[in-house]
Amino acid sequence: MAPFSPASSDVLVIGGGPSGTALSAELAARGLDVQQLAPHPPRPFPATYGAWLGDLPTWARGCAEQVWTDVRAYTGPQPTSLGQPYALLDNAALLRTLRGLADWTWVEGAALHAERSGAGWTVYGAGGERWQTRLVVDASGHGALVSPVRFPGGAALQTAYGVVARFRRPPVTPGSMVWMDYRTPAPELKRGEATFLYAMHLGGDRYFVEETSLIARPAPTRAELRRRLLARLSAQGTPPHATESEEWVAFPMNAQAPAPGGVLAYGAAAGRVHPVSGFQVAGALSDAPGVATAIATALCQGKDAAAAGWAALWSPERRAAREVHLLGVGALLGLERAELPHFFGTFFGLPREQWARFLHPDTDAGTLARTMLRVFAQTGGRVRLPLARAALAQPAASGRALAAAAGLKI
């Protein structure tokens, strides 16, 4: 006989990452009976999470393992100082802080699918389990177990391979964080897709170094990026002395704003990945209180909690902003390898408040569109042409973006 949980929770959150844990904590803090379902017990999140310090909610800034003020980008031979603090999150501290906000039940198991069951939901597990709940939330990450999102033209991926290692010679300037280094010291880096170095000095002789493909379709593989990283480090005379750990990431960047309805999703499962940077944790931590309040209010009033959650997570303003972001994705995908450094050279040459707002997780469509127009106006002709092609390929969306830039509503 299949295991069955007769006790119905108010909310069952699928996923054990930062997004699911943050939402579970905020829901429980509002007096709801919450179950969080993950294939493992509570444990520090395994990925490396960085964020602009100012994008994190105030409480989360105390969970920073390290903060750099020397943050730079190389889109040519000389560095551009970005002048904005950047944080590496301490995942154990983040989990500890979230778990300390409220009490909720952590359930070990793997969800397969969810179905409507009367006024609530039944979630079916891989081991034959069944969990009943008034509301189910899919926060399972980029895999989106029960609420898949759509990617226009197919998923365009960000892929990256990195290591934490010890170096006899520093691979980047000690004390610095390199957000993007498009220089090509090795022949390997002059072929194929453009990739860049993302690096953090962790103290002493320890560094995190990662070769990243910002967005591509198809994207470079783990093996390709590993070769590129090692070629880069070898060419600049800084091979790793002792590798402590490896990291590989691959996730889609071009999610459409999901249609409301069905299973409520959260975080990356809801498409809340920034389509230009790939960041999502700062946004998920910031969104959790508002989404939790909307859900709790709807459940208390006997209203559709999933609809309330979707409305809080994907407002009309956010949907308009995502459409503008996807125009930017089309532009990036249309740029040749040699054009990307020029594009970002222009981007980071804008006043800091302009490019920083573009990279912020919650910027309005008009501000985004005006920044894109400034980049178009200031960049060189060989970059401007593919940007124009990308805009002309989506005339309706481009028209709405221009209207937003002008402050018009259409």
UniProtKB/Swiss-Prot annotation:
Residues bound to NAD(+): 11-39
Residues in coiled coil: none
GO biological process, one term: carotenoid biosynthetic process
GO molecular function, one term: intramolecular oxidoreductase activity
Keyword Ribosomal protein: no
InterPro entries: FAD/NAD-bd_sf (IPR036188), Lycopene_cyclase_b/e (IPR010108)
SUPFAM superfamilies the UniProt entry points to: FAD/NAD(P)-binding domain (SSF51905)
Keyword set, alphabetical order: Carotenoid biosynthesis, NAD, Oxidoreductase
UniProt keyword annotation of Membrane present: no
Pfam families: Lycopene_cycl
Domain of life: Bacteria
Assigned protein family: Belongs to the lycopene cyclase family.
Listed PANTHER family: OS02G0190600 PROTEIN, PTHR39757
This protein's name: Uncharacterized carotenoid cyclase DR_0801
